[in-house]
Structure formats: structure tokens, C-alpha cells
Amino acid sequence: MNYTQTLEFLFQSLPVFETQGATAYKPGLERITAFCRHIGNPQRNFFTIHVAGTNGKGSVAHIIASVLQQAGYRTGLFTSPHLQDFRERIRINGVPVSQAFVVDFVEKHRSFFEPLHPSFFELATACLLYTSDAAD
């Protein structure tokens, strides 16, 4: 699959909250926990700042990432939703992951995640965690 086909597959086969609303919501941590275990629990190897709230999360997250980059840290940034391109969600030092990375991630892990039935958000989160080796 190429990048466009990969995104079409993801949007058509996974529940997407931004387009389907509450029907896409999947409570529980079982799927993301299983996915993390499958990819080697990368979340255990880096520090995390979680920004929550009603408004301004994206702006605050970008500011924090920028400050940390200026201090010499290599940062990973995950935001949701994206405006134009899925890769906006996952950035390493301000640069979106490559199209090839997204395609490779989906192809490599598809046989694992299809029977798991993750949400689109859970798959995007796992994709970010998989890039964690590139960040401090």
C-alpha cells in the first residue's frame, strides 16, 4: 500500500471519533495495553508531559515542545485531531513523521491490530509510541 491507500484503510476500518462521534469511543485500556506490549512497551523508555483540558491543549503542547527543543531536548509531540494530514498528529522535533513511516508501521503491525479492533486514536497513539526512540 502507498500512503494514500494506508490512510484510506485506516479511516475505513477503524472507528474515528472526529467523524463518528460517541459510537467510535471504546472505553478501557485493554487494546492500547496489548498494542504497547506488542511493540515492546516503548512508553516505559521516555518522559511524558500530558496536557489535558477543554481549550488550548494543542497550543500549550506546541509551546512546551518548543521550549524543550530550545533547551536541547529531542521531543516527540502527539496532537489530535489533525487538520490536513494524519502526520500532523505525530512530530519529532517539530517535523511530522514520514509517509513511509506510517505505511511501514501499519504494514508491520496490521496482522496484530486487525483482530484487536483498536480505535483510530489508539492506533495513532501506538504509532507515536513506536517513534519514541527518536525522542528524549
Give the positions of each predicted feature.
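Short functional linear segments
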Residues: M1-G53, V60-H62, S66-A71
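Generic structural signal for well-ordered alpha-helical scaffold segments
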Residues: C36-G40, R110, L129
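Solvent-exposed alpha-helices and their adjacent loops that cap or buttress functional pockets
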Residues: N41-R44, L83, S132
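N-terminal phosphate/diphosphate-binding loop that engages ATP/GTP or pyrophosphate donors
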Residues: I63-K108
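ATP-dependent adenylate-handling ligase core
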Residues: F105-E122
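Conserved small/polar residues in nucleotide/adenosyl-binding loops
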Residues: Y130-D136
